A protein has these predicted regions:
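Generic hydrophobic, amphipathic alpha-helix propensity
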Residues: 1-5, 21, 46-50, 54, ...
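Helix-turn-helix
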Residues: 4, 11-41, 45
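A short secondary-structure junction motif
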Residues: 8, 12, 54, 82-90, ...
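Amphipathic alpha-helical interaction segments
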Residues: 20, 70-78, 134-138, 156, ...
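Hydrophobic alpha-helical connector segments
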Residues: 45, 52, 56-85, 97-101, ...
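Amphipathic alpha-helical packing segments from all-alpha helical-bundle domains
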Residues: 49, 97-143, 147-148, 156-160
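Short linear capping/connector segments at secondary-structure termini
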Residues: 91-100, 179-182
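C-terminal peripheral helix-coil segments that are non-catalytic and often amphipathic
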Residues: 114-122, 148, 152-202
Length: 202
């Protein structure tokens, strides 16, 4: 059911009808509701499954044990690739951003990103004035803007824009104004923005 929900949410968004998910999963809609009483419960299950998949994918990148810049590039490209093909994850995480298990997974992923960024900065291969939160925002910006283009017949654009964004991390870049102090501050800002969008009906 989670896989079916992921596919349907990716195609239709979280407004997709439960009967459509049940049909794809090969079960009755009552079975879906017995396992997931609300659509938010189903969205949480989708978010958790996809974030766990992210965690495994990042572990694979780290296991290659290449130089720090190549590791960061591999992580950047892997996450942008995955997110650009996966409309369901971003929307699901938006809906269940305060779920404890989702938050725990996000923090684990943030720790992985922070370690890769520290290694690259220590090696002098990326700029010193960025934080892990900057990387997260950059990847999200690239990935979330691309699914409509993917469906419009340009499925590989994510790589072009991911690499353009990655090149902005070079150590000779222009000085930057202050950004988020840490990932917790970033998540708070994103949650506030989500609530404002909901109130405005966006």
């Amino acid at each position: 059911m989670i896989e079916a929900a992921t596919i349907v949410f990716a195609e239709q968004g979280l407004d997709a009808p439960i009967p459509e998910i049940a049909r794809l999963a090969g079960v009755g809609k009552g079975t879906v509701y017995r396992n997931f009483p609300t659509k938010e419960h189903l969205a949480a299950a989708v978010a958790i499954a996809r974030l766990e998949q992210f965690e495994r994918r990042l572990a694979d990148v780290l296991a290659e044990r290449v130089d720090p810049r190549a590791t960061l590039r591999g992580m950047f490209v892997a996450v942008a690739s995955h997110l650009s093909q996966d409309c369901a994850l971003g929307e699901a995480v938006d809906v269940v951003a305060d779920d404890p298990q989702v938050l725990a997974l996000q923090r684990r992923l943030s720790e992985i990103v922070a370690g890769v960024v520290r290694d690259a900065q220590s090696a002098g291969v990326i700029r010193q004035d960025i934080a892990p939160a900057d990387i997260t925002i950059m990847i999200m910006g690239v990935a979330r803007s691309l699914p409509p283009l993917n469906h419009g017949g340009q499925p590989e654009l994510w790589e072009r824009y991911a690499l353009l964004a990655f090149d902005s991390l070079r150590p000779d870049g222009s000085a930057l104004p202050a950004g988020f102090a840490d990932d917790d501050e970033m998540r708070l800002a994103l949650r506030t923005a989500r609530r404002l969008r909901v109130r405005r009906g966006a």
